[in-house]
Amino acid sequence: MAYEASLIEKKWQKIWDENEYFEPKDDLNLPKKYILSMFPYPSGRIHMGHVRNYTIGDVLARYYRKIGFNVLHPIGFDSFGMPAENAAIKHKIHPKSWTYENIAYMKKELFSLGFSFSKKRMLATSDPLYTKFEQEFFIKMFEKGLIYTKEANVNWCEQDQTVLANEQVEDGKCWRCGHEVVQKKMPGYYVKITAYAEELLKDLEELKDKWPNQVLTMQENWIGKSEGLEFSLNLDEESKQKTKESSLEVFTTRADTIYGVSYIALAPEHKIVQNLLSQNLLNQDVLNKIKVIQNQSPRERQSSEKEGYFLGIYAIHPLSGEKIPLWVANFVLADYGSGAVMAVPAHDERDFEFATKYNLAIKQVIQTQENLPYTQKSGKLIHSQEFDNLDCNEARLKIISQFEAKNIGKRVVNFKIRDWGVSRQRYWGAPIPMIKCQICGIVPQKLENLPITLPEDVQITGEGNPLDKHPTWKNCICPKCGKEAQKESDTLDTFFESSWYFARFASDEKTWQEKALDEKSVKYWMSVDQYIGGIEHAILHLLYARFFQKALRDLGYLTQNEPFDRLLTQGMVLKDGAKMSKSKGNVVDPDEIIEKYGADTARLFILFAAPPAKELEWNDDAVEGAYRFICKLYDRAQNVKKGELVELKQENLNKEEKYARLKVYEALKKSFEVYHQSFAFNTLIAACMEALNALALCKNEALEQEAFYIILNILEPIIPHVCFELSEELFKCKNFKKLELKEEVFVKDTLNLAVSINGKKRAEFEISSSASKEEILAFAKENTAKWLEGKSIVKEIYVEGKLVNLVIK
């Protein structure tokens, strides 16, 4: 009977579904595994990147389920967001309709691949119940001071007409639509992620060896902790009159280089610069260039060519008394430190680049024979008055102490990370649950009034926020004074939704109506044991999720410190050397692959083509090869003896049979390491192929039966449909359990030993593994007799199971 993928796959998907085979068990005393792949945005169809992500997660979920773990393997949809509004404009369809139609189609696609997701815990973040408890979290955070309002410069996308977080600006462009981003001053709500900066940084230690080093480094750099000196510099008298300021604050991490300062660089937003602008003391050219810098995002400023303009004013060095020129520069950020940076060109690459460009002084204060800039934090100080000849670290501490003693400076800790602006001027998002009252100010909604849902009778035009234009939706009564008020019309950044969905999944779905998180079940299931997703989320979703975990812990909802124990960042799927995209015309449709070859073939190719963390190059021939392997497996299984296993005795097997059995058990042994640790599924599949090839040379019915019993067990998480079909036919699926190794299989009958004379290999021989040391040495001498003739042996060395070395003279 030929292999018919479609019939087999539909049969088993129906059985699994009807028997709720993949739902987590209620017994919270069982050992658990929570396997989660990052949930998708419902764009309409899944792509091969999705297939790879969810196949990896599904393999692990199936494996742990098979060996007796209680497994939670959920899926949902990150369903709020701007693309739904763009689709509404383009296709004249309501964002909600577009979103839920896409969800329905993508669910069908996902389950056609045999993914073992829990259907009962499926959710969409645009569901009213999800919104209700997200709004509850917002209010609780607001009441605790973790969310506040302020007016600030924000990244504004003119195309999407909304605010973007710093992390959502890529090379000066919107991460979603690619449009230029400008700076705009607006009021908004901010999440105080900086309150957890120290803990977010410290707890990265707990994730070492469990998260990719690249992700840990990216988060560490984004948090950007720096310890240093904050100190005051007085302005000279003429500069005081111009700026209406007497001094300025400066932050530095290199107090040891303070005598090397040759200029002070200010952010364009610094009050001294703004005072000069307001008094028209800067020429029009400088004014125009400052405006250009102000419209750049922080990331764009950091990455662009260093530019600056002399302001015509000076500060006085607090120790040497020298005059230091003040410049405005594009690389200084207003909200990092004090918005003013002391520049030491001799010992900082950026400062050196700037000083060289504008012909500014370069003062060396650390002794070195190397070319400048010398940026190492080691060496003896020079040209630093009483601190000469001190090493950098000692000088740094003494200089800071002197500043503190004179009361002109202090030790401070700064972080690069900024509070997270979450207000978005769009319709398709979770409404911010706040009220604006002319009497009471900003007031939270009452919890019993949640969820605050979106009106459906809106016009999506792409111009401004539809909620602002709705004739009645904003109108409400202030819960504090009872007077007429207005609802907040901004909606939440969609990263707010994806920052806690993993905890909602961990909560028993039977409690979803009543509470955000069920204490008992989240305590059992959290943290996620294995999280899987793209590295592009390293400083977006992954950092926000870590913050949310800690904030919800402190609000009493959760108990764990970290949301994800282990993280795997899978590589991209490429075709013709490039990421798949419609514009490049290199997209492979998963539906077409499933229809032609079946889901198991798609899964096998995805896992065999490359290790999960590496990029995967799509190859049509390799897909054909995966299909042929499954057909061959299916065909060979038709000749395997059915029923109970016949016990095999190792001593009764011939050499070829022992070798084939060894290869089967080596594959089983490898499966333990691959499924538990390395995830090198390609090597495991190769080991199974090698075992089957060795088995083909044998004519032992009992051996073939045992081999299929084991190999179908190993491959079931990878190609589940065909393995269930064959295992049911041959073994009534009794092989789907935790299997044990048989040590006697690994005991070799013979040893292959090398013989060296004076360290140089001269011969090899095979001998019984039961031979004594004396027998082995005698055999070694016999095999090297011609090199020993006329020589005397002064030493005999036997490295057990490996080699013999004879020392002669």
From Swiss-Prot:
Reactions catalysed, as given in the entry: tRNA(Leu) + L-leucine + ATP = L-leucyl-tRNA(Leu) + AMP + diphosphate
GO biological process, one term: leucyl-tRNA aminoacylation
Entry-linked SUPFAM superfamilies: Anticodon-binding domain of a subclass of class I aminoacyl-tRNA synthetases, Nucleotidylyl transferase, ValRS/IleRS/LeuRS editing domain
Binding-site list for ATP: 582
Chain span(s) of sequence motif 'HIGH' region: 40-50
Positions occupied by motif 'KMSKS' region: 579-583
Keywords: Aminoacyl-tRNA synthetase, ATP-binding, Cytoplasm, Ligase, Nucleotide-binding, Protein biosynthesis
Protein name: Leucine--tRNA ligase
